[in-house]
């Protein structure tokens, strides 16, 4: 099961879907308010809302089945939360630069972004944030796509989805709260990230012997788009070994 990130949609996985669909039962989700999914009223875009949607989807459409849940960015945190809440539904988690394991210093930056989203134009704020997380090698067409997509989304979705990932009671993306969530996971986890300090910090958090954390240089936040073939090879090899 593939879960995209904040302001994304299932098309983010277009470079993975042909291979994954040829090897596995594959479900690519548009999260609420994103892509072709229903736009919910304001106040309905907290992490627990997204987790509840995926839990209901599996229970209704795939009862009794387990998934390897692959999440990018916000989707990585949703995958981890679902695995903690319903390990009977999740056999493993792949987090591609997931919203997990950030330092308290980064948490302060994210808090400022959440404030800017609340008081400013969320499409502009999101686009400015994206510019900070690309690699020099990132294709300009990807940058344009990400920016235009965010600017075309409902403002409430963009504003309300970001902050609770990193700020306030119940956040699980920063500091000790993120460590607590990750340490609670009993399923194998493969976390791919770009920051070597984050990779070192997170490695001791996962108890399953098949878990691992890798640092991926020469890629921006959308690692699976910047290094398509490498990610496909690494993720499928890990899934097959699990």
Predicted regions and their residues:
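Flexible "cap/lid" loop of the alpha/beta hydrolase fold
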Residues: 80-84, 90-124
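Short beta-strand immediately N-terminal to the catalytic nucleophile in serine-hydrolase-like folds
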Residues: 69-71, 96
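Gly/Ala-rich beta-loop-alpha elbow adjacent to hydrolase catalytic centers
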Residues: 71, 75, 79
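Conserved HGGG/HGGXW glycine-rich cap/lid loop of the alpha/beta-hydrolase fold
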Residues: 1-43
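Conserved acidic catalytic loop of the alpha/beta-hydrolase fold
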Residues: 49-66
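Conserved alpha/beta-hydrolase catalytic His-Asp/Glu region
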Residues: 104-106, 122-183
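Conserved loop-alpha-helix segment in the C-terminal half of the alpha/beta-hydrolase fold
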Residues: 184-225, 230
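Active-site loop signature of alpha/beta-hydrolase-fold enzymes
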Residues: 8-9, 34-37, 101, 199, ...
